Amino acid sequence: MKFIDEALIRVEAGDGGNGCVSFRREKYIPKGGPDGGDGGDGGDVYLVADENLNTLIDYRFEKRFAAGRGENGRSAGCTGHRGNDITLRVPVGTRAIDNDTKEVLGDLTKHGAKMLVAKGGYHGLGNTRFKSSVNRAPRQKTNGTPGEKRDLQLELMLLADVGMLGLPNAGKSTFIRAVSAAKPKVADYPFTTLVPSLGVVRVDENHSFVVADIPGLIEGAAEGAGLGVRFLKHLERCRVLIHLVDIAPIDESDPAENISIIESELFQYSEALADKPRWLVFNKIDTMSDEEAHERAQAITERLGWDDDYYLISAVTGKNVQPLCRDIMDFIEANPRHEVEQTADEAEVKFKWDDYHQAQLADHQFEDEDEDWDDWSEEDEEGVETIYKP
């Protein structure tokens, strides 16, 4: 299945149903009075996270999603049916952004998380709501309000504990194949990895973490060179970044300069991402002796002014890979993910007399009615209700 991590869709909530103007007409019940019902509220549009999805391909071709309109009110005080809600399933890790205002509406980071993205319109009021001591036969009603309509930008950001960084052919995919059951493509040419991939690293029976591999970065990626930096967003939720470096590049490039290139691209993309904990891991030490590998790594770190620890591994042979994984696991357990609790403020429950409808009622000024307040006539048929429409 094709990996799609961005989609632009239009969501339209349902309009509210209109109120009804109706009077009760029944023999032997003089002056039956108003009985027009309220309309129904418009349907809402929700996003819900589904762990069984891993791409936004469902929204590549189908772009418009509309909830149901609320039914109009009816006679006999019948309220219109509420419009049907619609729920759009998206992968866990999806972020919703208003495409016009660029406002981030929220992130869906847990399976089953649900988010309202378009609110349905309010229902209109029937003429029963306008009955008073001085207006016993009201012919007023209100119409329902339009539902929200918005262009929504969906962005999928993978949820992983560890993110892999490095130039093309640094050995990132080989490392993931060595430590997990994931089998990303490995070849001897740049940009073998074209889309992000995830692997689960199981340190022992009770401990595991998720590692994300993204396409390699090159100099100028922030300006769009290579595959650009569009996949760097998948590392924003990682707790630690593993910067994998080819200690002896086949093109004889300088490893210290290669490290500086990645650091520069990170800062140009996001300072927050650049400030994440980053571990330096030198790969492909199987191509030289242990003594030469240590000498090269020490010379590179001294040139960079790197004061933290670093690792020497061979992803092909598996040398020193398990100790690295255990250290990563210890770091993850010592630094649990701090999730912002998105607790929605409990809105005050208001049934029909909410602020909108109070304002609608206040807009109508009534005059004293005459004695023939309900327009009753002996010619009216038995059991017939009169409904007035504008």
Curated annotation (Swiss-Prot):
Residues 1-159 form the Obg domain. It is an enzyme of class 3 (hydrolase). PROSITE patterns: G_OBG, GTP1_OBG, OBG. CDD domains: Obg. Residues 363-390 are annotated as: Disordered. The keyword Lyase does not apply. The keyword Metal-binding applies. GTP binds at residues 166-173, 191-195, 213-216, 283-286, 314-316. One of its GO terms (molecular function) is GTP binding. Its EC number is 3.6.5.-. HAMAP family: GTPase_Obg. This is GTPase Obg. It comes from Pasteurella multocida (strain Pm70).
